[in-house]
Amino acid sequence: MTQSYVYVGLAGETAPGRPVKSGLYRMAVGDDRWELATRGLPEAPAIRAIATHPEQAGTVYVGTQHGPYRSTDHGDHWEKVNIADHGLPVWSLLFDPRDPRVLYAGYENCEIFRSEDEGERWRELPVTVRFPEITVAPGSNPAKRVLKMAVNPANPDEIYGAVEVGGVLRSLDAGEHWECMSHGQYLNDDTVDTHGVLVGRWRPGTVFAIARAGLFTSTDQGGHWSSARIESLNSKGQTYCRDIREVPGDPKTIWVAAGSNFQSDVGALFRSKDGGASWSRVKMGVEPKTTMFALAFDPRQPRRMFCATNGGEVFASEDGGESWIERPLPAGATQVYAMGCA
């Protein structure tokens, strides 16, 4: 049987007062020991994105402050893929489910690159949507980071991007043209500070977006949005959502990682068992002490799942989230941004 590994990426925030941590940790499933897997990565690697190859378990891509890197041996060694380093970090990576040779990389400053040969050559896509098109605030800054991307498995030319304080972007032609799907949604920065996006497979046309203000649902490919009813976790009546994942092979079951704010003492998981029609908070049996930031599933055994807080707490479940055990990172390893499993 092929050995599965779980990966956790750390990246320091540069805002005043926030500590800088970085690195990539790896754990073999069935073991309880974490090890650094940074050979060949840049010094003090800031890992904000992890993408595991859908057909080759040993091939993993990570996004760093110096562009994407690739490993073909489960993270034992890394090499930089051939894309010009322009000084901005990679925040998201996405495989085309129809052709895993095709890979997208989402950068800071709302840039998206596409490779059609597993990262050997890259082309910047014409993303022209900017922050003022989403808000009505005069003199607003350009939209920032493409924090996550998602693709419609039934039509891989349909791609979405979640942009920090920039809403949701959509392309219907594999990235050649983009449009803003958040017009009219702006109430304040909270509603368009978008952290993730997911194309639901259970109901065609359904798209989910998570943000600082909570969870939003569209039933018309992002044309219109409504707020999902989930338990609020902060004084604003909001839930700070950071990751959203569908269980492999089970399109009715969707998970959301959340907390009360970016850095908080509340970490929570929410689950839908009906394709996103209703949501409930999961009783984990353990108490996360910081905001839940990331989720990952073992594609070969989807009932095996992992979650992590930005404070470095990692939890594992072998029964689809019914029970959890702690698998904490080494002391001092915090600022978790990304997870992957393969």
Label the predicted regions.
Residues 1-342:
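Extracellular glycan-interacting surfaces
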